[in-house]
């Protein structure tokens, strides 16, 4: 083996070998239990980020663990066509390179352009996934716009439409005026901004006056431009100021429209003036109020967000209405919405109807891709009736067919599902699954899988002109079918039978509604088991938190705190890292701040750590469902762990290769250390498997670390040296056999989390055990064996460790050189302690570096010594001649004086009332903590002084 562990040399060639050999494929033996995971499809436009690395490490750990248990294992990969994101990427590309828009190309040619882009750049993220060691069956890779998946999408749409679970309706949606499409709530970014609240006077009609004698009401609004579409004013029915006005009317200024005053609990008596203008066509809350009170909807905006020439009027069912005039004053027609705001406020002011303007903090919705303010817009869209689909999906979680890990996410799921709204599934884009609906010249709609099917089913002659709906489906609609469409549905394929329901879905909690819930609803509606019962898409949902930076901030380009997982694998220079973080920024003014922060955090760039260290860190930080603060020090620690495992393996190989390791017969005698490490490893296997079975990857990683570093490397390898240096043939054979047995099994145990280093070492170790197989990936996973429990060995060796640690502690406390041989006395030793010493003298003497161990006769107190209590005895080290008493007392006195000075400094700081009052609580607490630490250290030094003074 190479003397130095260098992940760069081993990882990529090994992965290419695995993929070429087909080790990632299911073995196909359907008599064995299946285990499958469908990867949450990343956007085809995307690059691998920390969230992907985190979730994929968890998935690959599970897949490798289950594969090693002999299961028929499938990890299905794929990418999402990502409607808006992909369309924008290609639009920007043709604008930059050719100065063209998609409209210059036309729909079909532009879509061809996107397919061309996907062919060139779409594989970027899957190549990055390979770098993580993901054991995905790449031959089955899917794309949400593949022909098979497109057929599944059409099938689902047509069936739902025929069951009256899809309909077309005019309702409010989040509208992006820049991209000119409806967008989902997930694509809306709510930003806190400092804005204004305008207080406007609306004159009361018919000479009516308020309780205070005023002939107007004052409404407060943050969006005065929408007043052109007002169709009511709401007051709280319990509000004594206005309850007598319910049923009366106000005159809408500038328009002259009479609109009713309605009593509705949406109006908050404590907020603003207590009067709320109602604009059902431009506000989600007002839309609901309008429905309750049968108010017409007046749409005043174009799809670009400009004021229309004349308004559109609809009733609460979305049908065209003549309930009020569609006139809009000429002065405002065609104005951009925010220009209209200024003009309207000025017009109110001129009429004396602007009561006041107050500064107001508010939350404004922005499109996360278009970057402009989102408008609630009344549009014709396609909807899924979600309540019908939600009922069985709720029951599946209630009765435990689907388990959430951690369990608390069930409540989040239930709260949304039990109050579910119909789902808007249409988008005004070109890239995506085009809606399989056609219209004739009279506006009649026909839904079918193809135009030919529509004509045939509806007996439409060839001369009847049909035009397909221009809209495409929401990306979440096609990804909602992911678990079964990727397995060949609507065909009843063998894969669907073998791998569905899938075993686990690993996902972020932020898409629990957008994706997880919709997968459950759609799968249960379309996939039935042999008894005709709805089938769930997966048995377990493992929810992850977000990965944040070291300060707990969300990673984002604008904060300049994004860490690319592959930069931690391969390393990156400071210069390249700065370019990555500050190049092509949407807000270049932030670049200097980001530069300074990056230079401070990574003065020398990022060192290469290798994939295994990254995976180990991600597993170790995976505490269930919580957000994770990334920690570079942990990454360094796990890189050191890999190094430790490498060096330990080299030690084992140096002592076992070309030696008799007892695998071909011959007498073997196991030492206590051999028996202990076998028993310790057996227990480790049980705890580790329990952790993985319970999705506690953090606990599993810590168990692996603790056993490998502390038990195997720091104790067992040291304990083999007395045998290696002077054992009999049988003892040597026993220890070599144990070294190889434990290392080989440990590599199998660690493989799911750290696949590259374990395979590399295993390929070298396997020959010693006579294994001829080509890969560790397909080796059996270690199993706990109750018959291998050896409590005596565990207890005896723990006692020996205790004795050795006691000697080492005395050396450290008394400043005795580590290499100086010591005499040890045992006082008042029980028979058990005496047995342990006699049977294991060589272990204790070698590891504690002792000249001798003497058992004192009963009643003999022994010379003046430093003592430590161990189980069943008192351990003494006589100090005579070991230390220079005067020099040691002098050294301790100086240490005590130094601590007293520090304690005094902090005491005076804490007695200063000004400091305590002004300093942040955390700073004061830190000072108190420091003082407590110094006090404990001082007490220990004084105890040592007393011992030495008595010598």
From Swiss-Prot:
Alphabetic keyword roster: Aminoacyl-tRNA synthetase, ATP-binding, Coiled coil, Cytoplasm, Ligase, Nucleotide-binding, Protein biosynthesis
Coiled-coil positions: 880-914
EC number(s) given by UniProt: 6.1.1.9
Localization: Cytoplasm
Residues that, per the record, bind ATP: 557
SUPFAM superfamilies named in the record: Anticodon-binding domain of a subclass of class I aminoacyl-tRNA synthetases (SSF47323), Nucleotidylyl transferase (SSF52374), tRNA-binding arm (SSF46589), ValRS/IleRS/LeuRS editing domain (SSF50677)
Pfam families: Anticodon_1, tRNA-synt_1, Val_tRNA-synt_C
Gene3D superfamilies attached to this UniProt entry: HUPs, Isoleucyl-tRNA Synthetase, Domain 1, Valyl-tRNA synthetase, C-terminal domain, Valyl/Leucyl/Isoleucyl-tRNA synthetase, editing domain
GO term, biological process aspect, one: valyl-tRNA aminoacylation
Role description: Catalyzes the attachment of valine to tRNA(Val). As ValRS can inadvertently accommodate and process structurally similar amino acids such as threonine, to avoid such errors, it has a 'posttransfer' editing activity that hydrolyzes mischarged Thr-tRNA(Val) in a tRNA-dependent manner.
Subunit structure of this chain's protein: Monomer.
Name of the protein described by the UniProt record: Valine--tRNA ligase
Gene that produces this protein: valS
């Amino acid at each position: 083996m190479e003397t130095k562990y260098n992940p760069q040399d081993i990882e990529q060639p090994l992965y290419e070998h695995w993929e070429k050999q087909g080790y990632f494929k299911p073995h196909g033996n359907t008599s064995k239990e299946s285990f499958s995971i469908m990867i949450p499809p990343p956007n085809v436009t995307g690059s691998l980020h920390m969230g992907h690395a985190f979730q994929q490490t968890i998935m690959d750990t599970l897949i490798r663990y289950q594969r090693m248990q002999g299961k028929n294992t499938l990890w299905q990969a794929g990418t999402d066509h990502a409607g808006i994101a992909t369309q924008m990427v290609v639009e920007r590309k043709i604008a930059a390179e050719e100065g063209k828009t998609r409209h210059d190309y036309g729909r079909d040619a532009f879509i061809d352009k996107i397919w061309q882009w996907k062919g060139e750049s779409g594989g970027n993220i899957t190549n990055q996934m390979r770098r993580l060691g993901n054991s995905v069956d790449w031959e089955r890779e899917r794309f949400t716009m593949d022909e098979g998946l497109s057929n599944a999408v059409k099938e689902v749409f047509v069936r739902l439409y025929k069951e009256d679970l899809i309909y077309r309706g005019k309702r409010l949606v989040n509208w992006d005026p820049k991209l000119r499409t409806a967008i989902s709530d997930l694509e809306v970014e709510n930003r806190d901004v400092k804005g204004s609240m305008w207080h406007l006077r609306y004159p009361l009609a018919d000479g009516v006056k308020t309780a205070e004698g005023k002939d107007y009401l004052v409404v407060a609004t943050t969006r005065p431009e929408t007043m052109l579409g007002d169709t009511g004013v709401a007051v709280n029915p319990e509000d004594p100021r206005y309850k007598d006005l319910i049923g009366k009317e106000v005159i809408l200024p500038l328009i002259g429209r009479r609109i009713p005053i309605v009593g509705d609990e949406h109006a908050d008596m404590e907020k603003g003036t207590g009067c709320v203008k109602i604009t059902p066509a431009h506000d989600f809350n007002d839309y609901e109020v309008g429905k309750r009170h049968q108010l017409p909807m007046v749409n005043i905006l174009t799809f670009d967000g400009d004021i229309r020439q004349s308004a559109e009027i609809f009733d609460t069912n979305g049908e065209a209405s003549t309930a009020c005039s569609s006139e809009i004053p000429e002065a405002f027609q065609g104005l951009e919405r925010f220009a209209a705001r200024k003009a309207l406020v000025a017009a109110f002011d001129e009429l004396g109807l602007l009561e006041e303007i107050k500064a107001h903090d508010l939350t404004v919705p922005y499109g996360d891709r278009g970057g402009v303010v989102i408008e609630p817009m009344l549009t014709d869209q396609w909807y899924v009736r979600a309540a019908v689909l939600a009922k069985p999906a709720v029951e599946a979680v209630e009765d435990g067919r689907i388990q959430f890990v951690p369990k608390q996410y069930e409540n989040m799921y239930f709260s949304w599902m039990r109050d579910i709204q119909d789902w808007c599934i249409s988008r005004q884009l070109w890239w995506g699954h085009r809606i399989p609906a056609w219209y004739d010249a009279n506006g009649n709609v026909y839904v079918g899988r193809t135009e030919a099917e529509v004509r045939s089913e509806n007996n439409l002659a060839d001369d009847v002109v049909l035009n397909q709906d221009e809209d495409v489906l929401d990306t979440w609609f096609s990804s909602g079918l992911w678990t079964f469409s990727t397995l060949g549905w609507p065909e009843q394929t063998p894969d669907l039978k073998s791998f569905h329901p899938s075993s686990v879905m690993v996902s972020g909690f932020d898409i629990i509604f957008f994706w997880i819930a919709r997968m459950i609803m759609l799968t249960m509606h379309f996939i039935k088991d042999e008894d005709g019962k709805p089938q769930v898409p997966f048995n377990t949902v493992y929810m992850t938190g977000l990965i944040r930076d070291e300060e707990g901030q969300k990673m984002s380009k604008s904060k300049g705190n994004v860490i690319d997982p592959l930069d931690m694998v391969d390393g990156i220079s400071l210069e390249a890292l700065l370019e990555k973080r500050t190049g092509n920024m949407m807000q270049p003014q932030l670049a200097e701040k980001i530069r300074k922060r990056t230079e401070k955090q990574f003065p020398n760039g990022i060192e290469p750590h290798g994939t295994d260290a990254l995976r180990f860190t991600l597993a170790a930080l995976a505490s269930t469902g919580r957000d994770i603060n990334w920690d570079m020090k942990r990454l360094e620690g796990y890189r050191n762990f890999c190094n430790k495992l490498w060096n330990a393996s080299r030690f084992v190989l140096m002592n076992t290769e070309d030696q008799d390791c007892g695998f071909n017969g011959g007498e073997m005698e196991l030492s206590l250390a051999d028996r202990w490490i076998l028993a310790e490893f057996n227990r480790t296997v049980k705890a580790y498997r329990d952790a993985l079975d319970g999705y506690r990857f953090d606990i599993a990683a810590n168990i692996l670390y603790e056993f490998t570093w502390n038990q195997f490397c720091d104790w067992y390898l040291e304990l083999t040296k007395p045998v290696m240096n002077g054992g009999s043939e049988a003892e040597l054979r026993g220890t070599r056999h144990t070294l190889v047995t434990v290392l080989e099994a440990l590599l199998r145990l660690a493989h799911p989390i750290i696949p590259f280093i374990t395979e590399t070492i295993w390929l070298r170790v396997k020959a010693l055990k006579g294994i001829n197989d080509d890969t560790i990936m397909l080796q059996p996973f270690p199993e706990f064996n109750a018959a291998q429990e050896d409590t005596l060995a565990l207890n005896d060796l723990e006692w020996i460790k205790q004795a050795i640690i006691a000697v080492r502690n005395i050396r450290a406390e008394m400043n005795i050189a580590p290499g100086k041989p010591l005499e040890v006395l045992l006082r008042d030793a029980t028979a058990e302690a005496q047995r342990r010493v006699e049977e294991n003298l060589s272990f204790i003497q070698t590891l504690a570096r002792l000249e001798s161990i003497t058992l004192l006769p009963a009643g003999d107190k022994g010379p003046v010594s430093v003592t430590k209590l161990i189980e069943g005895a008192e351990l003494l080290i006589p100090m005579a001649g070991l230390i220079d008493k005067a020099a040691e007392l002098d050294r301790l006195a100086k240490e005590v004086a130094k601590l007293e000075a520090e304690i005094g400094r902090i005491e005076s700081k804490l007695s200063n009332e000004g400091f305590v009052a002004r300093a942040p609580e955390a700073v004061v607490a830190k000072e108190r903590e420091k003082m407590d630490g110094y006090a404990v250290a001082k007490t220990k030094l004084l105890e040592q002084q007393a011992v030495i003074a008595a010598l």
